[in-house]
Curated annotation (Swiss-Prot):
Methylation at Arg-927 is required for the stimulation of cell migration, dimerization and localization at the plasma membrane protrusions. The modification Symmetric dimethylarginine is found at R927. It is found in: Cell membrane; Cell projection, Dendritic spine; Postsynaptic density; Postsynaptic cell membrane. Activity is strongly inhibited by SRGAP2C, which heterodimerize with SRGAP2/SRGAP2A, thereby reducing SRGAP2/SRGAP2A levels through proteasome-dependent degradation. GO terms for biological process: actin filament severing; dendritic spine development; excitatory synapse assembly; extension of a leading process involved in cell motility in cerebral cortex radial glia guided migration; filopodium assembly; inhibitory synapse assembly; lamellipodium assembly involved in ameboidal cell migration; negative regulation of cell migration. This is SLIT-ROBO Rho GTPase-activating protein 2. The F-BAR domain mediates oligomerization, binds membranes, and induces plasma membrane protrusions.
Length: 1071
């Protein structure tokens, strides 16, 4: 029998096999389902592609129709003229050609999209239908093949099951036969053992009886042994037979198992792959590839056709040429634009003389008229040349505006990684509303100025043409055609004489000296045109060898002086920048690195003569100094290059004037900025060097300037001992309001904080310390404690002025109307001088200037009983009015004395153009009447002259204000000034903001002393004594003070320090 444990094991084996077969059968079923699902998805995809291209074909057809309608709409308007114009292609204007090509492109796109729609409907969609049908048919056949393969695999698995059962059966029989054989062997051994024991127990009795017993027992034992041996032999034969069958069955099972595993492996690895590749997907991807490539071919050909049309349009756009269009227009309408016939002389009543009569009675008149015409032409040409330069600079600005490269919209077609829609960049593009508004405003303003200058230039050229024709005919008649321009020859000879006698020409040195003294902060310097009459006067004076700008007089228009300097360099026979180095310099401009550009410019310029380099070094050092005041004069290096560049370097003939001028401007700007790195140092090249440190004494040392007298030197030494005592002690101040610094240089503090002031840095700033940090402190946000005690500020030039007792009527007159005759213009010049003197480390010239102020102030002194003045007066330092004034006193009175008109603010003087020639002439006349003699003056005579001059000046100012209200002063480079917000109605506690609103102070209030802070302020500021009450509430300033532009050296003369009012409501000391 077989053991129960063996049967249990057989059952487990069979159960495991059945489970494995079931899993395979389920897997085969899922495989067929998955293939069915793929087939359905494939059919659905092909159906979607058909629907997509069908809808796209409809859209393309609609788009084609709309494009055709659009093209026909505009072609109908231009067909009549178009037929005429296309008869001759050369008569088609370039904009019209662009328009025709654009319409043709639209029609071409319409035809292309119609073709594309037809391809979608009749080519691509049928391909997808065919692919769908083929895919479904092939899948059915593939499914049959797959089902057959699965049936074969299940058949192999069933065969393996049968062989396994047979193996189990034969193996069980073999085990059973083996156990029976072992049992028979045990019985045989047991029988043999019993026989041996019986023989041992029996005792032998007689020999005969023993022999008989033994024979019987042997016979019995033999029969039992034989039986056992026979049984053993049978069982042995049975075991051998079953064992052989079990071995054969096992071998058959192993062979079937190997075959089954090979079949399963082949089905999963090879059969399924071949079924999907060669049956299910047979031709599917290839057919789909051909259909989609048909789509790509259609789209690419559409794109190619579109690109061909766009290339034609691009060529037409590149060929947009105003000059060619002008020529075509004139050729098309030749009869309209051709010059008419000349007017012929029509004799009257038989008068046949058709030429000028140069006989003796009229010869002198013709000669005089020819000379007048020549002089007039010289002036007009200069004026027209100035207008032309301005017009060309404005044209360059317009070209920069209209040619800005803002047409690239590639950023709008950039897609994000998530395949979202096109980026919205409207706010950053050209079409943003703020950008359009600003661009249009700038463009319109520039265009208005350009057409104004163009009209002025054309009118001037017309006049020059008429006068030139008359002049030429007169010259021809008088036989003077060979005569050259006398004024030009005289000027050239004078210039050559000046150039040969000194390194820096007189006109250059004198103009730069004057501008450095009085015009560094003049708004629009070198940009605003001056008076041509005054330019000619100054130029003629220089040609005669004179220096009309020598001395301290300031009755010249700053713009006219700047025009003289530009005119000089423009008229040089040999310009500073020769034309043979033009291309080398233009090559330097293309370098992006500023240092490398400067190095290459230096190499190019070093080949020039030393005299030219000295003049260049002098000029560009001055221009660099001037550009440091760009916040006041609105002239940064780029603006200076635009206005001054054409005068220094002209574009050679044969070059594009507009494009080359932009490179010239960039070159001049680079030289202005990098002049120290470009030009040789004084050690490398000896010669005059422009000095920035306060031009007053520097230019007085010039061979063309005035020398300082011995009296001035003595007074400087005396004044130095008195001003150096208080230079070391700082001033304590209290913060009136909270202030937060806008830069690292400005200090931040809270209201009530204690501040330490070192010195006055500008009109609106102090240099001081707070919480151990040094920096700038705004003047309007603090109260200086020294002023509350009635003590005049330290280091103020006013502290050295002695108060002189005068009759009461003189004091009233001085307060009421003893104004400087030159009005606001001279006040501006004086304050500009003070600003320049602040930047000078030397104190001698500053004391000299304030010494002059003391002479000028002797006619407007305050009450001698004022405690603020009496505390700091020096008893013998000031002469009385009845004594003879020093040499420089009368001239400088016009700058610093009589503060009535000094109440004009800087912006008001700029707005009203108080530095116009008319006001200066009036001011000069008034000054010459009352101050230009060196004999003792009577105070009443001075007061009467001043009152008469003031009345005349105010009348002129009223007239000028009415004219300036409609006068437009254009700006070439479109610098934008902040609108002036000064109200014409002035509060009772403030100073008048304009000479037209100046009121005479006739109430004899005691002790009004002018604050020393007016040395840097434009508005006239007075400090009331403690008894004066201010009713206005305390408020912080409406606007923050403008940071000043400091020189490179930190040494500031103590003579320019000033104090503030202790009252927070006294805003008259600020601008």
């Amino acid at each position: 029998m077989t053991s129960p444990a063996k049967f249990k094991k057989d059952k487990e084996i069979i159960a495991e096999y059945d489970t494995q077969v079931k899993e395979i059968r389920a897997q085969l079923t899922e495989q067929m389902k998955c293939l069915d699902q793929q087939c359905e998805l494939r059919v659905q995809l092909l159906q979607d592609l058909q629907d997509f291209f069908r809808k796209k074909a409809e859209i393309e057809m609609d788009y084609s129709r709309n494009l055709e309608k659009l093209a026909e709409r505009f072609l109908a308007k231009t067909r009549s003229t178009k037929d005429q114009q296309f008869k001759k292609d050369q008569n088609v204007l370039s904009p019209v050609n662009c328009w025709n090509l654009l319409l043709n492109q639209v029609k071409r796109e319409s035809r292309d999209h119609t073709t594309l729609s037809d391809i979608y409907l009749n080519n691509i969609i049928p391909r997808f239908v065919q692919v769908s049908e083929d895919s479904g048919r092939l899948f059915k056949k593939s499914k049959e093949v797959g089902q057959q393969l699965q049936d074969d695999l299940m058949k192999v698995l069933n065969e393996l099951y049968s062989v396994m059962k047979t193996y189990h059966m034969y193996n069980a029989d073999s085990i059973s036969a083996q156990s029976k054989l072992k049992e028979a062997e045990k019985q045989e051994e047991k029988q043999i053992g019993k026989s041996v024991k019986q023989e041992d127990r029996q005792t032998p009795r007689s020999p005969d009886s023993t022999a008989n017993v033994r024979i019987e027992e042997k016979h019995v034992r033999r029969s039992s042994v034989k039986k056992i041996e026979k049984m053993k032999e049978k069982r042995q034969a049975k075991y051998t037979e079953n064992k052989l069958k079990a071995i054969k069955a096992r071998n058959e099972y192993l062979l079937a198992l190997e075959a089954t595993n090979a079949s399963v492996f082949k089905y999963y690895i090879h059969d399924l792959s071949d079924l999907i590749d060669q049956c299910c997907d047979l031709g599917y991807h290839a057919s789909l590839n051909r259909a989609l490539r048909t789509f790509l071919s259609a789209e690419l050909n559409l794109e190619q056709s579109k690109h061909e049309g766009l290339d034609a349009i691009e060529n037409a756009v590149e060929n947009l040429d105003a000059t060619s269009d002008k020529q075509r227009l004139m050729e098309m309408y030749n009869n309209v634009f051709c010059p008419p016939m000349k007017f012929e002389f029509q004799p009257h009543m038989g008068d046949m003389a058709s030429q000028l009569c140069a006989q003796q009675p009229v010869q002198s008149e013709l000669v005089q008229r020819c000379q007048q015409l020549q002089s007039r032409l010289s002036t007009l040409k200069i004026e027209n040349e100035e207008v032309k330069k301005t017009m060309e600079a404005t044209l360059q600005t317009i070209q920069d505006i209209v040619t800005v490269e803002d047409f690239d919209v590639s950023d709008c077609f950039q897609y994000s990684n998530s395949m979202e829609s096109v980026k919205s960049t409207v706010s950053e593009t050209f079409m943003s509303k703020p950008s359009i508004a600003k661009r249009r405003a700038n463009q319109q303003e520039t265009e208005q100025f350009y057409f104004t200058k163009m009209k002025e230039y054309l009118e001037g050229r017309n006049l020059i043409t008429k006068l030139q024709a008359k002049h030429d005919l007169l010259q021809k008649t008088l036989g003077e055609s060979q005569r050259t321009d006398c004024s030009l020859a005289r000027r050239s000879s004078t210039v050559r004489k000046q150039d040969s006698s000194q390194a820096i020409p007189l006109v250059v040195e004198s103009c730069i000296r004057f501008i450095s003294r009085h015009g560094l902060q003049h708004e629009g310097i070198f940009r605003v045109s001056g008076s041509q009459v005054e330019v000619n006067d100054i130029k003629n004076a220089f040609e005669r060898g004179e220096d009309p700008l020598a001395g301290d007089q300031n009755d010249h228009d700053m713009d006219s002086i700047a025009g003289v300097l530009k005119l000089y360099f423009r008229g040089l026979e040999h310009p500073l920048f020769p034309k043979d180095i033009f291309h080398d310099l233009m090559a330097c401009v293309t370098m992006d690195n500023l240092q490398e550009r400067a190095l290459h410019i230096r190499k190019v310029l070093l080949v020039l003569p030393k005299t030219t380099l000295i003049i260049m070094r002098y000029l560009f050092a001055f221009l660099n100094h001037l550009s440091q005041f760009s916040e006041e004069n609105m002239m940064d290096p780029y603006n200076l290059a635009i206005c001054f560049g054409p005068s220094l370097m002209s574009v050679p003939e044969g070059h594009d004037q507009v494009s080359c001028q932009a490179h010239v401007n960039e070159l001049i700007k680079t030289i202005i900025i990098q002049h120290e790195n470009i030009f040789p140092s004084p050690r490398e090249l000896e010669g005059p060097v422009y000095s920035r440190g306060g031009s007053m004494e520097d230019y007085c040392d010039s061979p063309h300037g005035e020398t300082t007298s011995v009296e001035d030197s003595t007074q400087d030494v005396t004044a130095e001992h008195h001003t150096s005592d208080d230079e070391c002690e700082p001033i304590e101040a209290i913060a009136k309001f909270d202030y937060v610094g806008r830069t690292a240089r400005e200090l931040s503090f809270k209201k009530g904080a204690s501040l330490l002031l070192y010195q006055r840095a500008s009109d609106d700033w102090w240099e001081g310390r707070h919480n151990g940090i040094d920096g700038l402190i705004p003047h309007q946000y603090i109260v200086v404690q020294d002023t509350e005690d009635g003590v005049v500020e330290r280091s103020s030039p006013k502290s050295e002025i002695e108060v002189i007792s005068e009759p009461p009527e003189e004091k009233v007159t001085a307060r009421a109307g003893a104004s400087c005759p030159s009005g606001g213009h001279v006040a501006d010049i004086y304050l500009a001088n003070i600003n320049k003197q602040r930047k000078r480390p030397e104190s001698g010239s500053i004391r000299k200037t304030f010494r002059s102020d003391s002479h000028g102030l002797s006619s407007s002194l305050t009450d001698s009983s004022s405690p603020g003045v009496g505390a700091s007066c020096r008893p013998s330092s000031q002469p009385i009015m009845s004594q003879s004034l020093p040499k420089e006193g009368p001239d400088k009175c016009s700058i610093s004395g009589h503060g009535s008109l000094n109440s004009i603010s800087r912006h008001s003087s700029l707005k009203n153009r108080l530095d116009s020639p008319q006001i200066r002439k009036t001011a000069t006349a008034g000054r010459s009447k009352s101050f230009n003699n060196h004999r003792p003056m009577d105070p009443e005579v001075i007061a009467q002259d001043i009152e008469a001059t003031m009345n005349s000046a105010l009348n002129e100012l009223r007239e000028l204000e009415r004219q300036s209200s409609v006068k437009h002063t254009p700006d070439v480079v479109l610098d934008t000034l902040e609108p002036l917000k000064t109200s014409p109605v002035v509060a009772p506690t403030s100073e008048p903001s304009s000479p037209l609103h100046t009121q005479l102070l006739k109430d004899p209030e005691p002790a009004f002393q002018r604050s020393a802070s007016t040395a840097g302020d434009i508005a006239c500021a007075f400090r009331p004594v403690k008894s004066v009450k201010m009713a206005a509430p305390v408020k912080p300033p409406a606007t923050r003070p403008k940071p000043t532009v400091f020189p490179k050296t930190n040494a500031t003369s103590p003579g320019v320090n000033s104090s503030t009012s202790p009252q927070s409501t006294d805003k008259s000391c600020t601008v």
